[in-house]
From Swiss-Prot:
Compartment(s) where it occurs, according to its Swiss-Prot or TrEMBL record: Cell membrane
The name this protein goes by in its record: ATP synthase gamma chain
Protein's organism: Kineococcus radiotolerans (strain ATCC BAA-149 / DSM 14245 / SRS30216)
Lineage of source species: Bacteria, Bacillati, Actinomycetota, Actinomycetes, Kineosporiales
Keyword set, alphabetical order: ATP synthesis, Cell membrane, CF(1), Hydrogen ion transport, Ion transport, Membrane, Transport
Function comment: Produces ATP from ADP in the presence of a proton gradient across the membrane. The gamma chain is believed to be important in regulating ATPase activity and the flow of protons through the CF(0) complex.
């Protein structure tokens, strides 16, 4: 019994050490998600204004821009998959990877070749394990992306979108990311990034919001040509921010669950340790009483 008691105490110390780690990770995620949510909210006004400017420029332009022109035959589709660099975030990465697999199957059923572009080490590990070819990948910033990260990705995608099929070009670009709804809910989503579908008309203003009037210098064509790459980068940046907030929320929730489970396990092991200690004490008392009885019996015979 003494050996069993030592084993229980050793397990309790181990679980307590793990609990300290999960609790610390929970607090770190909770503090960082506040900034991540603020970044998502801060990027919305710029994205809305840029959407309106692009829509207005497109409606006043005669430019047949390649980023807004539907191709007659789509041979190759790019899929930008936004995952995480680290684990311990529950089903966050597996959910977005599953959505990516669903999109890939749909595009292949339409006869399109897939060109994967990956964000995050989890997506890279997923593709490497299955020995799948990847066009490009980025990592190291999934929980705190910057606009420069989005611009790097956007520039590569726009460059490949402008290439011919024989040179490795793509005809469509889709983005798979996790949309942040709330601290409890995060949803994997798919958007078609290119060709742009949002420039068919000017976005309607909100209640009480004035519709801006645009004057284009030197021309609507020149403004549209300058705005479209920025618009692509802005949408990618928003997707990365949404994914970062979702990752941190999922990690906080997973670490809180792990901490709660550690508390329950410590209670269970403590109860078992107390039972083992009580059994040891009972056994020792029995041995003492037995020894005293034996001594008393031998003394009475003498």
């Amino acid at each position: 019994m003494a050996g069993q008691l030592r084993a229980y105490r050793r397990q309790i110390r181990s679980v307590q050490a793990t609990k300290k780690i999960t609790r610390a990770m929970e607090l770190i995620a909770a503090s960082r998600i506040i900034k991540a949510q603020a970044n998502v909210r801060a990027s919305t006004p710029y994205a809305r204004a840029l959407t309106r400017a692009v829509s207005a420029a497109a409606s006043n332009s005669s430019l047949d821009h390649p980023l807004i022109t539907e191709k007659t035959e789509v041979k190759r589709a790019a899929v930008l998959l936004c995952s995480s660099d680290r684990g311990l975030a529950g089903a966050y990465s597996s959910s977005v990877l599953r959505e990516g697999e669903r999109l890939t199957a749909t595009l292949r059923a339409e006869g399109k070749e897939i060109a994967p572009y990956l964000v995050g080490r989890k997506a890279a590990a997923f593709y490497n394990f299955r020995r799948r070819a990847v066009v490009d990948q980025w990592a190291g910033f999934t929980d705190s992306p910057s606009y420069e990260d989005a611009k790097t990705i956007g520039d590569r995608l726009v460059a490949d979108f402008g290439k011919e099929f024989a040179d490795g070009g793509v005809d469509e670009i889709h983005v798979v990311y996790t949309h942040f709804v709330s601290m409890v809910t995060q949803e994997p989503r798919v958007i078609r990034l290119l060709p742009l579908e949002v420039v068919e008309g000017v976005e309607a203003p909100s209640d009480g919001e004035l519709q801006p009037l645009y004057e284009f210098e030197p021309s609507a064509d020149a403004v549209l040509d300058a705005l479209l790459p920025q618009y692509v980068n802005s949408r990618i940046y928003n997707c990365l921010l949404q994914a970062a907030a979702s990752e941190l929320a999922a990690r906080q929730r997973a670490m809180k669950s792990a901490t709660d489970n550690a508390d329950e396990l410590i209670k269970k092991l403590t109860r078992l340790a107390n039972n083992a200690r009580q059994a040891d004490i009972t056994q020792e008392i029995s041995e003492i009483v037995g020894g005293a009885d034996a001594l008393a019996s031998s003394g009475s015979r003498a």
